[in-house]
A protein has these predicted regions:
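Redox- and metal-dependent alpha/beta enzyme cores, enriched for Fe-S-associated oxidoreductases
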Residues: 90-168
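A charged, amphipathic alpha-helical module
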Residues: 2-125
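Conserved beta-strand positions
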Residues: 181-184
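Peripheral docking tails and interdomain loops at the edges
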Residues: 195-214
Length: 214
């Protein structure tokens, strides 16, 4: 049988931390008046990197560095992807990957810039990435943490706080005045909170747009 390779595990853990640092940097950049990492690249790329890769491939860090250079260059130049940003939006709910181009339509047709999405808001803390006896023990807790905070599970499992309350915190952090809410007709976890989202958005003066799909 195969033996567990701690050297390989911690090499992967370092790449996971690298991806986490980049994700946090992109979120911070998107909280400014000139967001650079938006739309399908944020959602699809983060989904693939977190769920499909999770540090296993050595190809991702060089790609991340290249993306970061482009994003930083655009931020310094204050580049915009539309002539005018009418609204800054958080994209919430379970998105349809097959029509992800709607994020581009939001920018180019309506001037709504999607700052981040629910499925991309996954792990934000560093895991142990140095091979020591203590970290070998910590690794099991880190792997459990990454599974607990996987896409969808970290929002639809954990109750009201992670699904509703934290949405308003993200709106404040990202300076968002709109929520584009994917309403997956088969996803009962979010459908059951329909009234709560609508009521609390009205109280906060945040525009809430429901986009139905299945």
């Amino acid at each position: 049988g195969q033996h567990w390779d701690w050297s390989h595990y911690f090499a992967c853990a370092r790449r996971v931390n690298d991806a986490t640092r980049n994700r946090l940097a992109w979120l911070e950049m998107n909280s400014t008046p000139f967001p650079q990492f938006v739309g399908a690249p944020f959602s699809l790329y983060n989904d693939t990197n977190y769920m499909g890769n999770c540090g296993r491939s050595e190809k991702f860090p060089p790609i991340d560095r290249k993306i970061m250079r482009y994003a930083e260059r655009g931020s310094r130049a204050r580049r915009m992807m539309a002539k005018e940003y009418r609204h800054r939006a958080i994209v919430w709910g379970v998105q349809p990957q097959y029509c992800i181009d709607m994020l581009n339509w939001m920018i180019h047709c309506w001037g709504i810039v999607p700052l981040t999405d629910m499925l991309s808001l996954v792990n934000t803390r560093m895991i142990a990435d140095t091979d020591t006896p203590e970290n070998r023990e910590q690794a099991f807790y880190d792997m459990a943490w990454l599974n607990e905070n996987m896409i969808m599970r970290n929002r639809t499992h954990g109750g009201y706080k992670v699904l509703v309350d934290e949405l308003w915190e993200f709106c404040e952090t990202m300076n968002a005045d709109m929520i584009m809410m994917w309403e997956h007709m088969s996803c009962k976890a979010l459908t059951g909170m329909h009234g709560q989202f609508a009521e609390q958005a009205r109280e906060r003066g945040i525009h809430l747009v429901w986009v139905c799909h299945d």
